[in-house]
Regions:
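Beta-lactam-recognizing serine transpeptidase/beta-lactamase-like catalytic domain environment
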Residues: 1-163
């Protein structure tokens, strides 16, 4: 598969037809590009915005990192779909993944307890979708074809995504 002058490939040969689950569990770059194109650039970009991946995180520390600004140009949809083309801080990545598996709520990370015990959150996906994503991310670690089997630690429910 090509995007402009860049070749997009997989580390190994995959079947022509794969389920979304298999694409994610086995980490097919070509498959994730196809999924992203099916979703469409606008919806994909809006979802990344909902996850707060385009802005500097709001946090109580002055030394908080900022994502490198980028332009949404040719091949950006494709490269972001398989984990390249966008930078995030570890805090942003943790908050985004937490939202995907905690029932769909994006929670603003904080070090300070709110005096009224208010938690700032925003629903970004349905509870049902979150359950499905959690199942797939667990299979990335536990499935024989999963790409993160070394992360499967006895006594812990580890979820993951490589690539």
């Amino acid at each position: 598969m090509k995007c402009s002058v860049h070749k997009i490939s997989d580390i190994k040969k995959f079947p022509e037809s794969m389920t979304v689950e298999d694409i994610l569990v086995q980490s097919s770059n070509i498959g994730t590009v196809k999924i992203a194109k099916k979703i469409g650039e606008k919806k994909y970009k809006d979802f990344l915005k909902d996850l707060n991946l385009f802005n500097s995180p709001k946090f109580e520390l002055d030394e908080i990192g900022s994502p490198i600004p980028f332009k949404w140009n040719k091949c950006k949809l494709e490269t972001i779909s398989f984990g390249h083309g966008i930078t995030t801080t570890p805090l942003q990545a943790a908050a985004a993944y937490a939202a995907l598996i905690n029932g769909g709520m994006l929670i603003s990370p904080t070090l300070e307890k709110d005096k009224n015990n208010n938690v700032k959150f925003k629903r970004i996906i349905s509870t049902e979708t979150s359950k499905k994503i959690k199942k797939v991310l667990r299979k990335v670690v536990t499935d024989e074809k999963g790409t993160a089997s070394l992360a499967d630690v006895f006594g812990y429910e580890v979820l993951g995504k490589t690539g």
